[in-house]
Amino acid sequence: MPLSQTAVASVLTCGPGNDFYTTFGHSAIRICDTAQGIDLVYNYGTFDFDTPHFYWKFMRGQLDYMLGRSSFNGFMEEYIYYGRAVWEQRLHLSPQEVNNLYLMLEWNYQPENRYYHYDFFRDNCATRIRDMVRLSLGHTDTLIADYEGPVRTYRRWVTHELEGTLEWWRLGIDLLFGLPADHRCTDVESMFLPIVMHDIYAGTYPKGTDGPIVDESVQLLPEKRAPLSRSFPPVVVFALVFVAVALLTWKRKMPCWADRTLFILAGLLGLALLFMWFGTDHYCTEWNLNILWASPLLILIAIRLERSPKWALWLQEGCFAVAAVWVVWCGLSMALLPLILTLVLRVGVLLKN
């Protein structure tokens, strides 16, 4: 059934929550046609917890997400309960374009069409909405962004949201992300984050027109959630570890078991990163240069210590150097540097001995 001439389409942007999976906010599309009593929200961020082997598929990047549909009031209840902010951007679309968007969403909501293979950077709850809005205008290159915000890589967009309060989560993300995360994003690519899509839409207009695509922007809900407390910075923790190891090294009191523990833990981390690269479908964890310093080679060095071949020790020291340059060049968490320096120091002692 086609919509009336007064139907409107909006992009809903939801602010972050206090759980990690809500840190980056959320996006949805609202279709409101008061003449026909329609007020629906389409949400590409849902998944089925009853999926067999749910957590295993989630870890391996093989969990299908799906399009959900709910009433507008039902959608808002969750955000009222958790005290999360919600903004609405009413789109400047013709009645035909609103109807096109509605029909595409309804087709996409059919059971055989609603599932999709989630990708954190390239295919998520925000990018799906971005692409559906573009398609409703006729084809995919009808939007021009006049956005004057910063040009960032995928990694920097993500870690920017975590700085100051979720530094340990930022460190974890910098450990997991590989070279694909260091791609410099275009305006369109930057819209993978809901709040960034909100900001870019504010300065976006359809090709061939002078007016913006957003007719009106209102805040439906204020933020009422409790602010996150600042965590103890990981860079301080690992700097203290480095200082302690340096003092023990200077006094020649570093026990063998401590070296073995240090090297084995780093090597096991490297094996985990290799699994995330080769054993999963996650695009963002491929070509992870953290494997250069968290190297499985360190497990072999841990077994042999002073009896390790010189070539292996020199190779590992070279890998440390390359990894350190990558950490600085790409703006990874500075907490990684004291970790790398600790390993450099202890492998250097083995070389000297």
Where do the PLM segments sit?
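Glycine-rich catalytic cores of cysteine/serine-nucleophile enzymes that process amide/ester linkages
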Residues: 5-83
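Second-shell loop/turn segments in exported
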Residues: 17-18, 84-92, 111-120
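Extracellular structured ligand-interaction cores
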Residues: 26, 39, 88-90, 126
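A general structural signal for short secondary-structure boundary/capping elements
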Residues: 74-78, 90, 136
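Short, charged, amphipathic alpha-helices and their helix-cap/turn boundaries
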Residues: 96-105
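Activation targets extended, charge/polar-rich intrinsically disordered C-terminal tails
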Residues: 107-294, 298, 309-313, 320-353
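A conserved acidic, glycine/proline-rich C-terminal tail/linker
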Residues: 303-306
